[in-house]
Amino acid sequence: GGLYEHYQDNMQNPTFSLGIYTFSDVRAFLENRPLRFLGLGPEGAIDRYWRFDLLGAFVQDAWAVTPRLTLNLGLRYETSTMPIEKYGRDSALPDLLAPAPTTGRLYSNPPRRNFSPRFGFAWDPTGRGRMSIRGGYGWFINTNNQQNLIVTVTNPPATPRFVITNNVTFPNPPFERGVGNTMRPIEWNIMNPSLHMWNLNVQRQAPGQIVLTLGYAGARGVHLMRNTDINIPAPAR
């Protein structure tokens, strides 16, 4: 079998235009004395229009090795193209020490080694149809990770998000005193998240139309996505 999907992710989210005020304590909050403001400037764009494709293929077969043993074998491959913003407003940070982000693409290249095998079996050890042992293993790769694009909407230069720390006013912050920009880039050498799953079950038919089952299932995730702050200051002692 095969798969082809073309995606148009048209996003316009006014939530990104909301700012965040920080107060030093409850009294400062009640007296309307903000300590810090983080938010978009008046010209910040809150829309993005991404385009990308998802392609895949798979083979699968059930093989009756003997009347008592059946194998299920499969292999799947999927890949996605680089998400491209219609107006070229994507930006990235390949080098964490770089003074400014690069524009035009979000990360280096989509990973291509996305072969994911499947294996399963069903075995009747006695040949009397009263007991079965079943098991399987699968490697599942998530190649459609474009939900992470949303975190890049507030990245400069298209959508600068300013930090204001001096003489912050409410409700109209002084953007002309904004110091620097914040950025939420995607890992430049990104890897696709994957999940290894396996299970083993033993079933036994008991008298009175009762079936006893003992099973074990496990899973292990690799390269799972998460948000992390790479610029956390060292805790004071």
Describe every region a protein language model picked out:
Residues 1-237:
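Short acidic-glycine motifs
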